Amino acid sequence: MFGSLFKKKDTQRHPSAVPKEGNQSLSTTEAAALTKKVAALTTQIEQITDDKNKRHLLYNQLGATQVKLGNDLEAIAAYEASVKDKEEFGDAYNALLNLYETQRKQAAKAKNDDDIQKWVTKTDALLDMSKRVMRSGFGY
């Protein structure tokens, strides 16, 4: 009677490793183009001193480009600068959560307790920022 409701889980349906978007190997021309884009974005950011919204968007682009190049630490620096300019949910927030988790996992593999604590602390600070954003949106 209930045979059709309870099915066995198919273990073959779930792949063991899901390829990540940023870990694809880039050709030399793609890498060179992305490196040029990083240089151009960095120059634009240095020239903008008063418009935080525009600088925020440029930092987001810089972070995304650094992720494509596989430069996680540089991407983290760009996204942190973006969040510093404008605290909001969005690309920078989501990317930082993912990058912090990746760095924490690498530190755990290397059994480096100091780095694990560093990335956990950064994640906690980002979550605290999300609470501030939520509260500011509702007038608390």
Regions found by a protein language model. Give the residues of each.
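Structural marker of alpha-solenoid helical repeat scaffolds
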Residues: 48-51, 85, 133
